[in-house]
């Protein structure tokens, strides 16, 4: 043990050798000696290099610290004597110094690795924040994102993590990120779904083609792996418009009611959403009907707003938002192959759109038409250009993939003398006095076509040609026009002139040379010409969009709100904030759910003061019957806060209420307690009615209250029902569609007012009252053997909101419901016949069947019915009709809850629609 003090002294002398900071040195020394001092006895601690001779090793006094590296062992014996430095061994000194340096460096790496890892994670998260953003509907290849990460680590001199660890780091920043495997079989790749590259990122231009001159500029990334599936509009089902400018942020000129403006904007957004839904479902012809109905059926109290310049400009902004979403929906930016039928439908839609808008705006302020039509024309032009380009792209793609065709084109274009064509191009500018340095010269034309030749040699795809054209237009048109102050339009005209002339001379040479690939090259040239025109028009449209943005900024109090209107993207879920005026009662807000209500007018002799509001009409043809002095029911209780629902689609859901009333939250809208509630009549009407007539006939009448639900229990056979979405149905009798129309076999109208309000002995005679017709304010009675049995007016009748609108014949209101509009929620299904679903054997068609209970039951009303079934107690038969009717009832139908839960509800068959009053629903039934 004699050499132990020498070894100890040697180690102490060797300690200052490593140049370490005091903190690190102290930390390393504590880790080097501290654990050994705690594990081993105070008398025996050894420090020696592994394999060092001369170190006396006692059996029970020797141990190996598990925290030390395998090449270093700590063994040292401490005694109470003084350390001596008189004997030194040079070899031991060197070995001890190296061992200590090696151990300290290794321990430094181990202790710092945790800190470095945390620091690197923070840097990575910050880098992700700066370069990427949550972007719904965007796919980013996982390999590209990891390549960006490796580049980031190289620049920051960090040790990159593996792909799996990097994936966990990404999910720390984007927890909702998902992965998808996209591409053809055998060539699919994993993609991150829901993340996109920020435009401010340095990686944006390296991934996306160019600066995005058109919607197709970034398609190279999206098409990675290749898409073979044809584009379908069904993939866009559920698309909803972004928020329109809010009336709360508008600066008005003059005295304008903010509530009216808010109502008008909300109505217009619902109208635009309806147009979008029909476009997604391919019902382009129906869009014309919606346009006509919205503008020609504008409520009178909102018409003055259409002359206000601020409101007109807001309409233009809303149109721009709608057209951008329509373009994104109809034409895929991925350049997927589109079915020929869809392309033809879009072309036809673009061809007719301007005429549809002009027709719908007749008899409205000219200022509104003058502002809307230029935006319409830009939309139509863009739609035509993009469909044309997409059609050419999917035709040219097979030619570019055919190696034989590509080789033939390269061989033929090599024989064309581009320099000789360039000299001819001087003729086009010989008389020009423009001496600007940025002018597009013949040399530029030769260079551009030489680049085209090189692309063909490289077997470039359509996406590669688009990327190249983006660069050409950016460098030779847009950039130069900004540098020398020349207008973009002048520069674009000059470029197109030279490009077209040079291309025509190339085709001329190919024709003279009998080029075998003339047809293929002509196709490629048409594709390039179309894209250049599209890029130019896109730049012009962007300038117009900026003008609209500036216009909106002028009218908005909050600049951020105006920018949000143009930067917002369409979504796939929607929850409307229904702002109800404080002065408007709950009765003034129309129930948008399917709550069928029987509306009974009070005759002029009835107390209540409703006589002047409702007029009777003599028997005759209802189609040509004039309506004079008619009063809007909606005006009695104040303006409605929401637009009406079509009488032909009262059972549908909408993007606002999303389903039946039973499923609506209390905050969305008022919940009516009884189906007999009439929302268009104000409460002050009821106190004017005598107490004895609360049941409209008498207190002992078998008829329930028609205008509102009574708090007390009514006498008679017909109980009240308070379930939402219910209607008071007839048990045995199914109503044909003629029940709702204005035509019957016999005398349809009875000019004789009711003689008394007492109960009748027969059910047939007791219905001697007048019902509101769904098409107009005509009244039906059911006296006579061939008369109608009455009509049910939905709470959303157009007459209650739009007034006396008789421009639309009855035949359009209750036409065929087979080709219905499908909303953003429900699926696309046609309406099957009732007999095929509920009665395939025609068992229910039994007129002699025994009546089971009272006329009114608690079963829900179906939306469609076929062959009517007669109740045994009715003396007068109802004319049978094969046409479908909207509201026919039978207790054979399943409950409403079952229909809603199993998805077989008639609400889905008729398919929901945003709440806009649709009056054009196809052809009429039998006698209309």
From Swiss-Prot:
Disease: Mitchell-Riley syndrome: A disorder characterized by neonatal diabetes, hypoplastic or annular pancreas, duodenal and jejunal atresia, and absent gallbladder. There is no dysmorphic features.
Expression tissues: Expressed in pancreas. Expressed in pancreatic beta-cells (insulin-positive cells) and alpha-cells (glucagon-positive cells) (at protein level). Specifically expressed in pancreas, small intestine and colon. Expressed in endocrine cells in the islets.
GO molecular function ontology, one term from the record: DNA-binding transcription activator activity, RNA polymerase II-specific
The protein's name in its UniProt record: DNA-binding protein RFX6
Pfam families for the chain: BCD_RFX, RFX_DNA_binding
Function: Transcription factor required to direct islet cell differentiation during endocrine pancreas development. Specifically required for the differentiation of 4 of the 5 islet cell types and for the production of insulin. Not required for pancreatic PP (polypeptide-producing) cells differentiation. Acts downstream of NEUROG3 and regulates the transcription factors involved in beta-cell maturation and function, thereby restricting the expression of the beta-cell differentiation and specification genes, and thus the beta-cell fate choice.
UniProt region (Disordered), positions on chain: 1-20, 50-98
Keywords annotated in UniProt: Developmental protein, Diabetes mellitus, Differentiation, Disease variant, DNA-binding, Nucleus, Transcription, Transcription regulation
Protein location: Nucleus
Stretches assigned to coiled coil: none
Entry annotated with the keyword Electron transport: no
DNA-binding residues (ranges): 124-199
UniProt record, GO biological process: endocrine pancreas development; glucose homeostasis; pancreatic A cell differentiation; pancreatic D cell differentiation; pancreatic epsilon cell differentiation; positive regulation of DNA-templated transcription; positive regulation of insulin secretion involved in cellular response to glucose stimulus; positive regulation of transcription by RNA polymerase II
Lineage of producing organism: Eukaryota, Metazoa, Chordata, Craniata, Vertebrata
């Amino acid at each position: 043990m004699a050499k132990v003090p020498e070894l100890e002294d040697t180690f102490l002398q060797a300690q200052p050798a490593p140049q370490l900071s005091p903190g690190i040195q102290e930390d390393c020394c504590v880790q080097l000696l501290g654990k050994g001092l705690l594990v081993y006895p105070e008398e025996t601690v050894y420090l020696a290099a592994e394999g060092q001779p001369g170190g006396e090793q006692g059996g029970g006094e020797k141990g190996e610290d598990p925290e030390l590296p395998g090449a270093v062992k700590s063994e040292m014996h401490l005694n109470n004597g003084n350390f001596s430095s008189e004997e030194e061994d040079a070899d031991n000194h060197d070995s001890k110094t190296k061992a200590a340096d090696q151990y300290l460096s290794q321990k430094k790496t181990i202790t710092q690795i945790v800190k470095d890892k945390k620091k690197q994670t923070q840097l990575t998260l910050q880098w992700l924040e700066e370069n990427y953003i949550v972007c719904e509907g965007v796919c980013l290849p996982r390999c590209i994102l990891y390549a960006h990460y490796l580049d980031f680590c190289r620049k920051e001199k960090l040790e990159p993590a593996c792909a799996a660890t990097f994936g966990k780091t990404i999910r720390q920043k984007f927890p909702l990120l998902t992965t998808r495997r996209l591409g053809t079989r055998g060539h699919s790749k994993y993609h991150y779904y829901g993340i996109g590259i920020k435009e401010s990122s340095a990686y944006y231009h390296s991934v996306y083609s160019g600066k995005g001159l058109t919607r197709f500029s970034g398609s190279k990334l999206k098409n990675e792996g290749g898409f073979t599936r044809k584009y379908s509009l069904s993939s866009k089902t559920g698309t909803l418009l972004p928020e329109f400018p809010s009336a709360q942020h508008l600066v008005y000129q003059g005295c304008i009611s903010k509530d009216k403006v808010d109502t008008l904007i909300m109505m217009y957004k619902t109208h635009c959403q309806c147009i979008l839904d029909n476009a997604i479902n391919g019902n382009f012809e129906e869009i014309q009907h919606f346009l006509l109905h919205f503008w020609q059926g504008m409520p009178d109290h909102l018409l003055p707003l259409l002359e206000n310049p601020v409101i007109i400009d807001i309409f233009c902004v809303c149109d721009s938002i709608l057209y951008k979403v329509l373009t994104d929906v109809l034409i895929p930016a991925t350049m997927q192959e589109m079915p020929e039928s869809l392309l033809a439908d879009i072309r036809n839609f673009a061809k007719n759109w301007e005429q549809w808008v002009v027709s719908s705006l007749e008899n409205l302020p000219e200022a509104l038409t003058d502002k809307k039509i230029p935006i319409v024309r830009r939309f139509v032009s863009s739609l035509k250009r993009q469909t044309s380009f997409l059609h050419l792209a999917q035709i040219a793609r097979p030619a570019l993939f055919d190696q034989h065709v590509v080789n033939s084109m390269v061989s033929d274009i090599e024989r064309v003398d581009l320099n000789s064509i360039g000299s001819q191009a001087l003729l086009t500018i010989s008389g020009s006095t423009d001496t600007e340095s940025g002018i597009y010269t013949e040399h530029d034309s030769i260079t551009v076509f030489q680049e085209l030749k090189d692309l063909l040699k490289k077997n470039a795809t359509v996406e590669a040609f688009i990327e190249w054209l983006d660069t050409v237009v950016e460098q030779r048109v847009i950039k130069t026009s900004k540098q020398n102050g020349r207008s973009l339009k002048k520069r674009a005209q000059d470029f197109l002139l030279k490009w077209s002339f040079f291309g025509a001379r190339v085709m001329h040479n190919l024709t003279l040379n009998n080029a075998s690939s003339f047809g293929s090259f002509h196709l490629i040239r048409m594709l390039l010409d179309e894209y250049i025109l599209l890029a130019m028009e896109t730049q012009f449209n962007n300038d117009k969009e900026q003008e609209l943005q500036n216009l909106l900024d002028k009218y908005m109090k909050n600049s951020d709100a105006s920018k949000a209107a143009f930067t917002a993207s369409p979504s796939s879920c929607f929850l409307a904030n229904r702002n109800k005026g404080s002065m408007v009662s709950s009765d003034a807000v129309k129930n948008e759910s399917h709550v069928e209500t029987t509306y009974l007018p009070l005759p002029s002799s009835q107390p209540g003061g409703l006589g002047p509001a409702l007029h009777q009409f003599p028997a005759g043809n209802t189609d040509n019957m004039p309506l004079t002095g008619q009063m809007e029911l909606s005006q009695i209780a104040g303006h409605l806060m929401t637009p009406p629902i079509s009488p032909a689609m009262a059972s549908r859901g909408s993007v606002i209420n999303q389903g039946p009333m039973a499923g609506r939250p209390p905050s969305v809208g008022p919940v009516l307690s009884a189906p007999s509630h009439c929302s268009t009549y104000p409460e002050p009407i009821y106190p004017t009615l005598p107490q004895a007539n609360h049941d409209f006939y008498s207190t002992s009448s078998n008829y329930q209250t028609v205008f509102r639900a009574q708090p007390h229990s009514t006498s008679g056979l017909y109980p009240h029902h308070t379930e939402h979405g219910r209607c008071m149905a007839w048990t045995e009798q199914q109503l044909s569609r003629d029940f709702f129309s204005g035509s019957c076999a016999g005398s349809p109208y009875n000019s004789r007012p009711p003689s008394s309000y007492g109960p009748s002995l027969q059910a047939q005679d007791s219905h001697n009252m007048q019902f509101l017709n769904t098409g107009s304010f005509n009244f039906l009675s059911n006296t006579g053997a061939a008369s109608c049995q009455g009509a049910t007016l939905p709470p959303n009748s157009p007459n209650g909101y739009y007034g006396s609108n008789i421009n639309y014949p009855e035949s359009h209101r209750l036409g065929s419901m087979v080709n219905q509009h499908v909303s953003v929620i429900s699926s696309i299904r046609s309406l099957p016949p009732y007999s095929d679903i509920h009665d395939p054997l025609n068992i229910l068609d039994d007129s002699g069947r025994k009546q089971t209970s009272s006329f009114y039951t608690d079963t829900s009303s179906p939306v469609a019915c076929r062959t009517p079934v007669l109740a045994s107690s009715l003396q007068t038969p109802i004319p049978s009709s094969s046409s479908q009717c909207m509201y026919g009832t039978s207790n054979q139908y399943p409950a409403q809850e079952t229909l809603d839960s199993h998805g077989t509800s008639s609400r889905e068959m008729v398919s929901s629609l945003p709440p806009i009053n649709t009056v054009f629903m196809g052809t009429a039934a039998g006698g209309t």
